[in-house]
Amino acid sequence: VLSPADKTNVKTAWEKVGGHAGEYGAEALERMFLSFPTTKTYFPHFDLSHGSAQVKAHGKKVADALTTAVSHVDDMPSALSALSDLHAHKLRVDPVNFKLLSHCLLVTLACHHPADFTPAVHASLDKFLASVSTVLTSKYR
């Protein structure tokens, strides 16, 4: 459960991401594909090379979903319901992959905003991404 301090940390951190959200989303995906090659199996139709337009487009989708989650932090299940349905019923993404992408997002944010990535912010973002992952896997039944 996100505390009021966690919510403030997440919102403040995401505001600093600003217009770079899509870029960071793509970078995190690229980092995930390189670090955890098995994740590529969900994207057989993508050009996964560095700078790929498809990876950039999907990175923007990831970032947009996270922006929605930040904006609706008190009601993520409703805000992310359609995305949860998509991942559970159509895409059938193994839930462990959300943890892998979350880790890569944290690394990406830490690389771009090292001064702002304090232990408290790190912990808050980690809890937030875990909450998003829980929502996205909630319909896996």
Curated annotation (Swiss-Prot):
<dbReference type="GO" id="GO:0005833">
    <property type="term" value="C:hemoglobin complex"/>
</dbReference>
<feature type="modified residue" description="Phosphotyrosine">
    <location>
        <position position="24"/>
    </location>
</feature>
<feature type="modified residue" description="N6-succinyllysine">
    <location>
        <position position="40"/>
    </location>
</feature>
<feature type="modified residue" description="N6-acetyllysine; alternate">
    <location>
        <position position="16"/>
    </location>
</feature>
<dbReference type="Pfam" id="PF00042">
    <property type="entry name" value="Globin"/>
</dbReference>
<dbReference type="GO" id="GO:0005506">
    <property type="term" value="F:iron ion binding"/>
</dbReference>
<dbReference type="GO" id="GO:0031838">
    <property type="term" value="C:haptoglobin-hemoglobin complex"/>
</dbReference>
<dbReference type="InterPro" id="IPR002338">
    <property type="entry name" value="Hemoglobin_a-typ"/>
</dbReference>
<dbReference type="GO" id="GO:0031720">
    <property type="term" value="F:haptoglobin binding"/>
</dbReference>
<dbReference type="GO" id="GO:0043177">
    <property type="term" value="F:organic acid binding"/>
</dbReference>
<dbReference type="GO" id="GO:0019825">
    <property type="term" value="F:oxygen binding"/>
</dbReference>
<feature type="modified residue" description="Phosphothreonine">
    <location>
        <position position="137"/>
    </location>
</feature>
<dbReference type="InterPro" id="IPR000971">
    <property type="entry name" value="Globin"/>
</dbReference>
<feature type="modified residue" description="Phosphoserine">
    <location>
        <position position="138"/>
    </location>
</feature>
<feature type="binding site" description="proximal binding residue">
    <location>
        <position position="87"/>
    </location>
    <ligand>
        <name>heme b</name>
    </ligand>
</feature>
<protein>
    <recommendedName>
        <fullName>Hemoglobin subunit alpha</fullName>
    </recommendedName>
</protein>
<feature type="modified residue" description="N6-succinyllysine">
    <location>
        <position position="7"/>
    </location>
</feature>
<comment type="subunit">
    <text>Heterotetramer of two alpha chains and two beta chains.</text>
</comment>
<feature type="domain" description="Globin">
    <location>
        <begin position="1"/>
        <end position="141"/>
    </location>
</feature>
<feature type="modified residue" description="Phosphothreonine">
    <location>
        <position position="108"/>
    </location>
</feature>
<feature type="modified residue" description="Phosphoserine">
    <location>
        <position position="124"/>
    </location>
</feature>
<keyword id="KW-0813">Transport</keyword>
<keyword id="KW-0561">Oxygen transport</keyword>
<feature type="modified residue" description="Phosphoserine">
    <location>
        <position position="35"/>
    </location>
</feature>
<dbReference type="InterPro" id="IPR012292">
    <property type="entry name" value="Globin/Proto"/>
</dbReference>
<feature type="modified residue" description="Phosphothreonine">
    <location>
        <position position="8"/>
    </location>
</feature>
<comment type="similarity">
    <text>Belongs to the globin family.</text>
</comment>
<feature type="modified residue" description="Phosphoserine">
    <location>
        <position position="49"/>
    </location>
</feature>
<dbReference type="InterPro" id="IPR009050">
    <property type="entry name" value="Globin-like_sf"/>
</dbReference>
<feature type="modified residue" description="Phosphothreonine">
    <location>
        <position position="134"/>
    </location>
</feature>
<feature type="modified residue" description="Phosphoserine">
    <location>
        <position position="131"/>
    </location>
</feature>
<dbReference type="GO" id="GO:0020037">
    <property type="term" value="F:heme binding"/>
</dbReference>
<feature type="modified residue" description="Phosphoserine">
    <location>
        <position position="3"/>
    </location>
</feature>
<comment type="function">
    <text>Involved in oxygen transport from the lung to the various peripheral tissues.</text>
</comment>
<feature type="modified residue" description="N6-succinyllysine; alternate">
    <location>
        <position position="16"/>
    </location>
</feature>
<dbReference type="GO" id="GO:0042744">
    <property type="term" value="P:hydrogen peroxide catabolic process"/>
</dbReference>
<keyword id="KW-0007">Acetylation</keyword>
<dbReference type="InterPro" id="IPR050056">
    <property type="entry name" value="Hemoglobin_oxygen_transport"/>
</dbReference>
<keyword id="KW-0408">Iron</keyword>
<feature type="binding site">
    <location>
        <position position="58"/>
    </location>
    <ligand>
        <name>O2</name>
    </ligand>
</feature>
<keyword id="KW-0349">Heme</keyword>
<dbReference type="GO" id="GO:0005344">
    <property type="term" value="F:oxygen carrier activity"/>
</dbReference>
